[in-house]
């Protein structure tokens, strides 16, 4: 189903670019995703209910999403017609990926053993942008005492690990090779 969601996201992304609505559509999709992310199971039930017609599913969309961008509403109608309303979170993720790629940006999770100061965060973000060649990094911070010290950054599938825990694991591996 991820492939299906990717197709919807790509179509919406292309329309967003063509109509110069990329920012608006991204903002509205973010709000919609927040609103429905805990209701995916209920949306699956709507999708799989054989007694509910496409028109009834469209009415549901009209009732819930009153003042949304017409391109998003049209996509939601297509999702409803094809019994794919429950894919909206996957469509959002795929759209975000396209959006981030377009602006050469990505999300980064920075883990440390304590709350980092703004100066420390700025240094880490600078390092991450240099290492990943991204123009912008959107940061989420987490405190992880298991790291012992230092920090670990996850950007997509890339992990930059400057933690004491990682240093100890590497040292342990070297000792095992010697023995």
UniProtKB/Swiss-Prot annotation:
Organism domain of life: Bacteria
Membrane topology recorded in Swiss-Prot or TrEMBL: Peripheral membrane protein
GO biological process: proton motive force-driven ATP synthesis
UniProt keyword annotation of Ion transport present: yes
Gene Ontology MF term list: proton-transporting ATP synthase activity, rotational mechanism
Main location: membrane
Compartments reported by the entry: Cell membrane
Pfam families: OSCP
Subunit structure, interactors included: F-type ATPases have 2 components, F(1) - the catalytic core - and F(0) - the membrane proton channel. F(1) has five subunits: alpha(3), beta(3), gamma(1), delta(1), epsilon(1). F(0) has three main subunits: a(1), b(2) and c(10-14). The alpha and beta chains form an alternating ring which encloses part of the gamma chain. F(1) is attached to F(0) by a central stalk formed by the gamma and epsilon chains, while a peripheral stalk is formed by the delta and b chains.
Function: F(1)F(0) ATP synthase produces ATP from ADP in the presence of a proton or sodium gradient. F-type ATPases consist of two structural domains, F(1) containing the extramembraneous catalytic core and F(0) containing the membrane proton channel, linked together by a central stalk and a peripheral stalk. During catalysis, ATP synthesis in the catalytic domain of F(1) is coupled via a rotary mechanism of the central stalk subunits to proton translocation.
Family: Belongs to the ATPase delta chain family.
HAMAP family noted in UniProt: ATP_synth_delta_bact (MF_01416)
Protein name: ATP synthase subunit delta
Gene: atpH
């Amino acid at each position: 189903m991820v492939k299906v969601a990717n197709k919807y996201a790509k179509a919406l992304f292309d329309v967003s670019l063509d109509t110069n609505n990329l920012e608006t559509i991204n903002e509205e999709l973010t709000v919609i995703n927040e609103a429905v992310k805990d209701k995916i199971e209920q949306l699956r039930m709507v999708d799989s209910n054989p007694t509910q017609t496409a028109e009834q599913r469209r009415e549901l969309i009209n009732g819930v999403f009153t003042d949304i961008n017409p391109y998003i509403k049209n996509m939601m109608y297509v999702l409803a017609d094809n019994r794919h309303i429950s894919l909206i979170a996957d469509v959002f993720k795929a759209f975000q990926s396209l959006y981030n790629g377009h602006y050469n940006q990505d999300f980064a999770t920075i883990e440390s053993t304590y709350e980092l100061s703004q100066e420390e965060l700025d240094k880490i973000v600078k390092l991450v942008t240099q290492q990943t060649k991204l123009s912008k990094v959107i940061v989420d911070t987490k405190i992880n005492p298991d790291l012992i010290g230092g920090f670990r950054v996850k950007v997509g599938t890339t992990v930059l690990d400057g933690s004491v825990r990682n240093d100890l694991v590497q040292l342990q591996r070297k000792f095992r090779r010697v023995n």
